[in-house]
From Swiss-Prot:
Record keywords, A-Z: Cytoplasm, Methyltransferase, Mitochondrion, Transferase, Transit peptide
GO molecular function: heat shock protein binding; protein-lysine N-methyltransferase activity
PANTHER family named in the record: ELECTRON TRANSFER FLAVOPROTEIN BETA SUBUNIT LYSINE METHYLTRANSFERASE (PTHR43648:SF1)
Cellular location(s): Cytoplasm; Mitochondrion matrix
CDD domains on file: AdoMet_MTases
Transit peptide region: 1-32
Annotated family: Belongs to the methyltransferase superfamily. ETFBKMT family.
Species name: Mus musculus
Top EC class of this enzyme: transferase
Predominant localisation class: cytoplasm
Record-given protein name: Electron transfer flavoprotein beta subunit lysine methyltransferase
Subunit structure: Interacts with HSPD1; this protein may possibly be a methylation substrate.
Amino acid sequence: MAFSLCWKAPRSPWSFLQAVNNGSPLFLWRTVGSCLDPKMKAYLEENTEVTSSGSLTPEIQLRLLTPRCKFWWERADLWPYSDPYWAIYWPGGQALSRYLLDNPAVVRGKSVLDLGSGCGATAIAAKMSGASKILANDIDPIAGMAITLNCKLNGLNPFPVLTKNILNTQQGKFDLIVLGDMFYDEDLADSLHLWLQNYFWTHGTRVLIGDPGRPQFSGHSIRHQLYQLVEYTLPEPTQQENNGLTTSAVWDFHP
């Protein structure tokens, strides 16, 4: 079975937000290459492809797994690290990134937290659009490395990447939180909803959510607190990679 078919949908409901395993270290990248293991960097470069096609944001180059990569076709268990969700440009993230690029005033001069950052595309879009401070968050240390590489691809100085579960910690104030494709499991959706509500009530922070209309999102109670800002038709390659999902939208959170 092709590797991509095994992990297109996360198997674990906590895959983005819980530690990869109990022994995983937590890293915070602050400068280009400061924590990039040379062997890991070489492995990622060998087994991903730099691409800007087939997405809503041709302005952004990313290292992704594509059909031209070996592990797109290999069995999932042959990939030697945690499941590489960061190596797919998910449709909710595409919509968020497109929206920020088209509406730079949303982030210009503001501090932004990209929750479940994955490949880092939305954080990169925020930086391109003039955000003054960015923190990308993903629990997978390899995602942190990939984000740093993707910053370099786009001519950006890297922003901090925090690789830990922040749902059980207190964070400083950000002007904007963005998250895409995080409502794929009911339990995770409940936890995110509670965390976002508490953060909003504490800090008054604006929250933007990108999602292609997965059932776990469309049927969740958070929908009663959301206002749709925009909906995009997904490019054909993204539709094919996501089981026929045809659109993706950006929502403004108003609890």
